[in-house]
From Swiss-Prot:
It holds the Pfam family Hfq. One of its GO terms (cellular component) is cytosol. GO terms for molecular function: RNA binding. PANTHER family: RNA-BINDING PROTEIN HFQ. It comes from Cellvibrio japonicus (strain Ueda107). This is RNA-binding protein Hfq. Keywords: RNA-binding, Stress response. The keyword RNA-binding applies.
Length: 88
């Protein structure tokens, strides 16, 4: 995992695993709502009544509906290795 993704991937992974409803604001101001179904280096799959593939470069802000705890990289069972669990 590159340094640029050391927070992004664990954060999205917690949102995905805990099925936290999120609001995603795009750079053009559009608000999307749903749950993070999956993600990779370039896109986030957002599920609501339909699944939408949203390109990360178009995302301005991700707002969860509740507080989430992101594991630190040095914690046991932390973000390292959880990347493989994205396709549930």
């Amino acid at each position: 995992m590159s340094k640029g993704h050391s927070l992004q991937d664990p954060y999205l992974n917690v949102l995905r695993k805990e099925r936290v409803p999120v609001s995603i604001y795009l750079v053009n101001g559009i608000k999307l709502q749903g749950q993070v179904e999956s993600f990779d280096q370039f896109v986030v799959l957002l599920k609501n009544t339909v699944s939408q593939m949203v390109y990360k470069h178009a995302i301005s802000t991700v707002v969860p509906s509740r507080a989430v705890r992101v594991p630190l990289l040095n914690e046991a069972g932390g973000a390292e290795g959880e990347e493989d669990e994205q396709a549930e």
